From Swiss-Prot:
Record field: compositional bias (Basic and acidic residues): 85-98
Keywords: Cell outer membrane, Membrane, Signal
Residues making up the signal peptide according to the UniProt record: 1-33
Family membership: Belongs to the LptD family.
Functional note: Together with LptE, is involved in the assembly of lipopolysaccharide (LPS) at the surface of the outer membrane.
Entry superkingdom: Bacteria
Alphabetical list of InterPro entries matching this protein: LipoPS_assembly_LptD, LptD, LptD_C, OstA-like_N
Location of this chain's protein in the cell: Cell outer membrane
UniProt main location, coarse: membrane
Compositionally biased region (Low complexity): 65-79
UniProt-listed GO biological process terms: Gram-negative-bacterium-type cell outer membrane assembly; lipopolysaccharide transport
Protein name: LPS-assembly protein LptD
Presence of keyword DNA damage: no
Amino acid sequence: MALKSPAFRKKFPLLVTGSLLALQPLATSFVVAAEQYDCSVSASGGWACAPKTSAAQLPPRPVHDANSVSSSVATAADATGEEASGDKSKLVTEAKGRGLKSRSADYSHLDWVPREKLTAAQLAETGPYCSGSYIEPIRPGMNDKTNKSDAPTFIGAKASRYQQEEQVATLAGDVVMRQGSMQVEADEASLYQAENRGELSGNVRVRDNGALLVGDHADIQLDTGEAKVDNAEYVLHKSRVRGNALYAKRAENAIIRLKDGTYTTCEPNSNAWQLKGNNITLNPATGFGTATNVTLRVKDIPVLYTPYIYFPIDDRRQSGFLPPSFSTGSDTGFMLVTPYYFNLAPNYDATLYPRYMAKRGLLMEGEFRYLTKSSEGQFGAAYLNDDDTDRKKQTDYEKTRYMLNWQHKGGLDSRLMTEVDYTKISDPYYFQDLQTDQIGVKATDYVNQQGVVTYRGDDYTARLNVQAYELASVANITPYNKLPQITFNGALPYHPQGLDFTYETELVRFDRDLLTGNYTDKDGGPIDPVTGAVGTRRLDTNVAGLARANGDRLNLKPGVSLPLNWSYGYLTPSLKYMYTQYNLDLDGTGKEGIVAARNYATATGTRYVGGDYSRNQNRGVPIASLDGGLYFDRNTQWFGKNYRQTLEPRAFYLYVPEEDQKDIPVFDTGEPTFNYASLFRDNRFSGSDRVGDENKLSLGVTSRWIEDNGFQRQRISVGQALYFKDRTVQLPGIDYRTRADATSNVSPYALEYEYRYNRDWRATADYNWDPDSHSARSGSAMFHYQPEDNPNKVVNAGYRYRNDQIRYDQNSGTWKMGGDYGTPGQPGYVKDYYKIQQHDFSVIWPIVPQWNAISRWQYDYNRNRTLEAFGGFEYDNCCWKLRLISRYWVKYDEFSQNAPENEKGDRGIFLQIVLKGLGGVMGTKVESFLDKGIQGYREREDQAF
């Protein structure tokens, strides 16, 4: 039955009893009434009942089972006897953290649905190791958002009786009361009009907004919806949270309070872990809970106590402590992190990370995040008064350690964009000694200090960039800063005769302050036995000649091209002109270095390949190219499957005249390693300080196998360049006559290959073969397997080889080819230090249900050493996860300026325990090296629930 409630909600009991009188005949044959009544809502909001003028023929009585309510003495006595003779309902405390099986063997009383009975949509939302899920049954009003004071009330039962003098309504048999989204179910109910309350007994269920309370007996306040359920169990469906309590109270605002209660995300038949507290409060409105005098129990055994805990019950944000983590390490000793989250507003928040380290003290770190309609970003800071003294004798070490960070992206409008990436650290050893929890802060050799303003027009882009770097290493030379850099690039909006006109403009100031003096290591040395000098020269003192210059650079690069496109191919002639003007400053040390290098070359009879200093330098170089390709395709079959196979030959001719550039310093230029894409670049250098002279014809061909649905099964590209002159323009210090690849008539053969067996696994390879030396110049082969429908399986295998690096040598201050560190015969020299010849294998694979093997092995064949190896296992179920991994790795910790001396092997055994619903208890570092070391690990975790 359904009646619209009067506007005043406190008349709810009268509404119930009146509805019973008005709409339901008396239930039992032994109830005798002298009069029948017609009842309706009065003008005052109460009920007006009047005797019927005539006793009409009543409809037949419904037949009810033995559970129907009765007032006969005999029936009541029989019922009492049956109850006394039957088994009493078990207490929830007897279940020891599991669901109460006496209520239902399959835990259906908790809305538990086994995995085999879940629908496809429900399975997609259920973790792979969960044997089922809590599914709230569909019921009328479950999504009703109407205020309860305005919502109609529904009452149903198999039998009912009303005692008018006592103003008590008694319901029996499948009792259901519903108002708005709240629904109460029981075997029997007594509603007391005078006291505005009800008593329910037998299989009591209280449902509201995705929460379920189950108990043996309940008291409910009819005018507010407050309820107390004895011997209670509860479920929060979406959060997969359940528990029990001596009794549970539901407040009018739907907050649930538990006396001597438990909290867990484990399945009903599991007591793997639970929180047990004297008083537990769950607030579905905020998504968080609190508990006092709490013990964390594993298999009902207490393992941890806390007087207070604040924990999430869903994924919403709320201020409070986050799960703590603790670990041990040689640099920190015992470490405990107790993060606290501040939910300040919907669009900004903050997190404080107090990090106690037994060897170093208390590191206070925090971050503030913000989000507006036009911007997003974060501020971060960290501070430590370091108690550790291992580095106190090292140069640049600071006892007061700190880090500041600001990251920002925003737009003043749709065209004007701003970006900031600024990090400052107290000393170059900060990231080697200390961890950071700030999002986006990367531990590299340099920290970025950059601010950018970009304006995007219809046909152009203007950009102002101010960028500096701070060293986070003592084994590198101080880099150049751009203070500032202004670029203006675009294309003309008109295209006469199909011509495209483009332009690139840059004005930038390069500046750096090179460090002077000596560097002392962790022992305060070394001490020269002859001179008594302490320490070694800083690496910055190795920078000599033009490499010490600062200056301004103006670069202009207009271009014109004529793209011609047809269905069968394309042809694009292009002409560019690159003009660069320099205004340089060189200190006395740099000028003296140029003179000394010239004198040394003269004395030894060698060729001087360095440059001469002139304050004003300029260079103008035309760049002409002709790029063309054809497109052929055909329908074919491969292993019985239809494909469209393409054949795409390409020819690229490039002519750039030789221009002497040795008097120009290198500010931001390098030479990328050779690959297939190198064949079709118009400058073999990156940056603007060098324009490579070229007279070459590059030939390449690509073939693809494409399925009818557009899926590219396979792609292969192969090509080679034919050179018609030597490449004389080189980076400073390199003589083209000593480079075999600069005087060769042909480039290496370049090959790229990709094969996808399906969307689950793929293989990629690249290979560069030098026909002059009949040897591989570089190459790699990678295999990756991870099924879309089961990302828990991950296999990676790869091999890399490279020995054609062009790099800046920190020890000599010059550009060099090859992989050697330092100079032969000099201290610290290591042959083939930078040469790459490695294999990398990693796997995550299920062994048996819920058990996975995890392993990685990265080996360096060049130096016959293992770079990293770890192996272990993972146990994962619906409510907790454990990983135990043994790991060996090469650790880099700077106690010297010579990079090879800072490498040493380290070992560790890592344990990670994750209680789902509470977070990681220990072992957060495990996440870090698994994420970095195993491709596909992050995708696996994101999809594994």
